[in-house]
Amino acid sequence: MARKITIDPITRLEGHGKIELLLDEEGKVKDAYWQVAELRGFERFCLGRPAEEMPRIVPNICGVCPSAHHMAATKALDDLYSVEPTPAARLIRELEYNAFYIEDHYIHFFFLAAPDFVVGPHADPKERNILGVIGKVGTEIGLKVIEVRKRNRDIIRHIFGKAPHPEGGLPGGVPRGISEQDRKWIKDTAAFSLEFAQFAIQLFKDVVLSNKYYVDLILNEAYKLKTYYMALVDEDNRANFYDGKVRVVDPEGAEYLKFDARDYDQYIGEWVEPWTYIKLNHLRKLGWQGLKEGDGTSLYRVAPLARLNVADAMQSPLAQKEAVIMFDTLGGKPAHQTLATHWARLICALQAAEQNVNIADDPQLTSKDIRNMNLKLKNKGVGCVEAPRGTLFHHYETDDEGILTKVNLIVA
């Protein structure tokens, strides 16, 4: 007799979701649905509000990556008001965003992913959690994970007032600067973060890559999906988290598209299905081809593995060295092994730490010129960043008083 299996809620993920499996008369899977069953409504209830309120509202979309929404909103205001942040303000923003990348990637790896890789997929489900991870790696490492996240959240809090859910985003700049006294503890935090990033990658090699079972799992054909990939890159096609062009490569790794974030709606299509509240994004020129991978797909993937697949190189030397090792292990580029996303995540955290070491030494960081007030409303603004789990777009339109008349969000 046909029946249905429901897994609700799904745990250890960012947000809420459930899985429904429909079985045929023989008990085999006939269909499967991954559902986001909650209506968020941010695109609607923000209408009628002043645009400058968005950096205070949208961090509440997510408790894991509020800084990504905050920064996308702030950059959308830059575009809306036709203003570029000052060089010092941009440095401070990148410092904060790298700090967020570091603490966010480690909450994902150690709290959400490591229970499967470190504790093990065959362990008792009651042990597959952060306490089980600490039981395996030791209290000292557990305390380091907490410390690296706390210290980087202190940077976020110092610049934008709160962590999580920062709220100080301003068009053309930042709400406060960095003093020379601040620079000292920021340098210490950056150095500690770099040391921890190298340790985390070595831990992954020691625990995961030295275990044939895990390596076979990562390389297993069942966990490969051939799709297009999307991410931000700089002018040299290196991975950029804060800014740059949106680049798309095809399943073979060749460049398919490259465009300004402001033109995203010419290249990205949004599809809806009756069984989920989430929008299903695809490459507009290819049309909606359904949830299929391989030949004929119009789907693109984002997040850390996509970031490394899209970029010709990382921006920092240690991260680039680790990316080469990863692709050599996976059999070349692009890599379609979904489980390798966790490895790529640690490499992205390493780049963020390397960049903050450099930013902390930059003489311009302590400049008092932190706001460009040459604002000119142009009624439309789009902001884009690489959220930890992928390319994020915020699109705002206003009337001549700066009151929102349209909000569209493409959330990774």
Task: Name each model-derived stretch.
Residues 1-391, 401, 411-412:
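Active-site bordering "gate/hinge" segments
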Residues 392-396, 404-408:
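Extended hydrophobic-aromatic, low-complexity segments
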